């Protein structure tokens, strides 16, 4: 009986110790590397790591979150209307839709005149939950700026913030 209790206690201590070591890339923090993210792009998958070396405006949205949808439009207007200086480097927009319906997303992209090439999806519920937790979006969907080194440099930037950060 003592051995069983010792074994259970050892297992409990091991569990507590193991959970104390969290991969820093699993939670978004400004100044740290962006959490890993893989999204659907048509018939293929795209990793956020594939944009290393570029500025990335990472924006999460859904039809049900009006603020996130308005942010999509702000980012689209920013990208169309602001000539970025050559020294800013390449800027990519990764707009991640969390709606279950791909058709709904496609309709909104057309209605809002968004760039189809920058639209991606997470259609798996567990991956969507991971993204919500990793990017700390418990109170609504958000937008982030990632520098060419892959570090988060801004959260929920305004158009003026985007101009200042990227140029």
Feature-to-residue mapping (PLM):
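Short active-site neighborhood of thiol/selenol oxidoreductases, capturing the structured segment around
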Residues: 47-72, 92-94
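N-terminal targeting signals for export/organelle localization
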Residues: 1-35, 167
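Short, internal strand/loop/helix patches
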Residues: 106-142, 148
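Thiol-/selenol-based redox modules, centered on thioredoxin-like
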Residues: 83, 139-167
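Structural microenvironment flanking redox-active thiols in thiol-disulfide oxidoreductases
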Residues: 69-112, 126-131
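N-terminal "domain-start" segment that seeds a small globular fold
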Residues: 20-49, 70-73, 119
């Amino acid at each position: 009986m003592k051995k069983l209790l010792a074994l259970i206690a050892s297992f409990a201590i091991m569990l507590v110790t193991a959970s104390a070591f969290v991969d820093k890339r699993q939670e978004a923090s400004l100044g740290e590397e962006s959490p890993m993210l893989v999204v659907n792009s048509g018939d293929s998958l795209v990793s956020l790591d594939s944009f290393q070396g570029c500025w990335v405006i990472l924006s999460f949205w859904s039809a049900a979150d009006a603020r996130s949808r308005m942010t999509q439009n702000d980012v689209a207007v920013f990208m169309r209307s602001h000539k970025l200086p050559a020294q800013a480097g390449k800027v990519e927009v990764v707009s991640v839709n969390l709606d279950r319906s791909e058709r709904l997303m496609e309709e909104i992209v057309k209605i809002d005149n968004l760039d189809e090439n920058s639209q991606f999806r997470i259609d798996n519920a567990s991956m969507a939950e991971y993204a919500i937790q990793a990017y700390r979006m418990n109170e609504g969907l958000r937008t982030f700026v990632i520098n060419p080194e892959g570090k988060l440099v801004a959260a929920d930037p305004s158009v003026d913030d985007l101009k200042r950060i990227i140029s």
